Every structure is written in C-alpha cells, then in structure tokens.
Amino acid sequence: MAKEEAIEVEGIVKESLPNTMFRVELKNGHVILAHLSGKMRKHYIKIVPGDTVKVALSPYDLTRGRIIFRER
C-alpha cells in the first residue's frame, strides 16, 4: 500500500508554542497546529510569528501539520 501524499499549503505563523510547535493561519482562514520538520531543526532554522511558511498536511488529520519551508 502506497503512502498517501501530503497536502502542501501556505500560511502565516501566528503564535510560537513550546517544543517547536506553532499556531499557523492558512490562506483559507483555518488555524492549525504545526511542528517543525526534522531538517529545519537540524539546520537551526528559526521561525518567528509573522513568517510565511509552507505546511504539509496529512489527508487524515487536517488540523495538524509539519512546517517544511520558511519563505524569505
């Protein structure tokens, strides 16, 4: 059985939470809880409120996501 494809959407970080968790408001208005991806943790990429980020959502739970890219 193949792994389901992640849904990639853009959003703006609204709040920084403990343990590299962030509250992100998506372009469609939904607010989700997102954590930092492993590569971003490894390379110490900092995320602050107000940053535009790309989030990967699982098709099974659309309220949680993984931040995979920070726009410059």
UniProtKB/Swiss-Prot annotation:
GO molecular function: ribosome binding; rRNA binding; translation initiation factor activity
SMART domains registered for this protein in UniProt: S1 (SM00316)
Subcellular location: Cytoplasm
InterPro entries found in the cross-reference section: NA-bd_OB-fold, RNA-binding_domain_S1_IF1, S1_domain, TIF_IF1
UniProt cross-references to Pfam families, sorted A to Z: eIF-1a (PF01176)
Major subcellular location class: cytoplasm
Residue span(s) of domain S1-like: 1-72
SUPFAM superfamilies the record matches: Nucleic acid-binding proteins
Family to which this protein belongs: Belongs to the IF-1 family.
Subunit record text: Component of the 30S ribosomal translation pre-initiation complex which assembles on the 30S ribosome in the order IF-2 and IF-3, IF-1 and N-formylmethionyl-tRNA(fMet); mRNA recruitment can occur at any time during PIC assembly.
Role according to the record: One of the essential components for the initiation of protein synthesis. Stabilizes the binding of IF-2 and IF-3 on the 30S subunit to which N-formylmethionyl-tRNA(fMet) subsequently binds. Helps modulate mRNA selection, yielding the 30S pre-initiation complex (PIC). Upon addition of the 50S ribosomal subunit IF-1, IF-2 and IF-3 are released leaving the mature 70S translation initiation complex.
Protein name: Translation initiation factor IF-1
